[in-house]
């Protein structure tokens, strides 16, 4: 049961009332690299994506780097990377070859990137961010809110949003091999022509230290995460839509159009990674092969645990373990128990 709760979708198995957290020693510094690079043509755009993929494979595919790089607005590469275990000078040195390559070419517009390092123990201190990096986080403005309540400013748009489409895929590290990079680059560019693509490097475990790989291997998650250098997320939505929510509006035509483009973008990306797994918590509500996508070879064991601890099917989750035995609303058993 403990194994199943670690990645199997906890709500499918019971109610967790208490847990113990494992803590880890902090490095001296955490830090971030921010920037945007826009290409002037399709040819320059593909060259930029190719250069970044090669740079990532040789310089960032390690335990120091994570978070995201996004392909957005057709021809813009947005950098939102974080690092740990490096100081600011080391982080700047790591990126210097890539930034020099961009600066040498007139087909790219590029504002100077921001590279910052902060003491790791201040990473959750909102007052530190307000003083040293204003705008990076936003304070909770509700009356009476605790002074330690803050959130990443870029996440603010998710409050109350209505999701039109949400797709994810684990991208295998083999795509970073020199002979496979062209396939990956073509797929990324084709997908980004349809919709923005975010590569979440911290959510792929390949390149992590052995201890982290071993700990992840001892979970119910799709084992594909162990060999993934990134989780690709292609998603979009709009403002509040449910009745009673402030400012609720419904634009069904726009929502369906967005959903179609999001699916098309993921279809294009999956040409480089057919049958890629997906992350349970950030994935397609309509995932057709959800058992394999979410859990791979672990699903059979999860199903046996579900049958043992919840034979009556009290706990039902859409596309959760054992949900194929029930109607879509979870109230009618459609397969014998």
Go through the PLM ranges and name each one.
Residues 1-337:
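Soluble FAD-dependent oxygen oxidases
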């Amino acid at each position: 049961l403990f194994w199943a709760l670690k990645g199997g979708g906890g709500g499918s198995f019971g109610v967790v009332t208490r847990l113990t957290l494992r803590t880890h020693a902090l490095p001296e510094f955490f830090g971030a690299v921010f920037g945007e690079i826009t290409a002037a043509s399709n040819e320059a755009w593909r060259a930029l994506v190719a250069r970044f993929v090669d740079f990532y494979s040789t310089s960032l595919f390690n335990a120091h780097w994570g978070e995201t790089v996004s392909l957005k607005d057709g021809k813009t590469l947005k950098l939102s990377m974080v690092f740990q275990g490096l100081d600011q000078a080391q982080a700047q040195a790591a990126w210097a070859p890539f930034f020099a390559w961009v600066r040498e070419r007139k087909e790219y517009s590029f504002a100077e990137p921001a590279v910052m390092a902060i003491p790791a123990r201040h990473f959750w201190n909102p007052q530190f961010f307000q003083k040293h990096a204003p705008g990076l986080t936003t304070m909770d403005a509700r009356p009476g809110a605790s002074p330690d309540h803050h959130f990443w400013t870029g996440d603010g748009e998710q409050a109350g949003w209505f999701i039109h489409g949400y797709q994810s895929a684990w991208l295998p590290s083999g795509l970073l091999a020199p002979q496979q990079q062209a396939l990956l680059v073509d797929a990324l560019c084709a997908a980004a022509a349809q919709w923005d693509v975010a590569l979440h490097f911290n959510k792929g475990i390949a390149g992590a230290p052995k201890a982290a790989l071993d700990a992840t291997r001892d979970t119910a998650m799709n084992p594909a995460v162990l060999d993934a250098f990134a989780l690709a997320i292609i998603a979009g939505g709009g403002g509040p839509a449910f009745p009673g929510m402030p400012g609720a509006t419904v634009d069904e035509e726009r929502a369906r159009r967005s959903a179609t483009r999001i699916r098309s973008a993921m279809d294009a990306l999956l040409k480089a990674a057919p049958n890629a797994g997906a992350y349970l918590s950030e994935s397609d509500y309509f995932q057709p092969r959800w058992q394999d996508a979410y859990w791979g070879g672990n699903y059979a064991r999860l199903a046996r645990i579900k049958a043992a601890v919840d034979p009556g099917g009290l706990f039902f989750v859409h596309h959760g373990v054992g949900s194929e035995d029930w109607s879509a609303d979870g109230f009618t058993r459609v397969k014998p128990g």
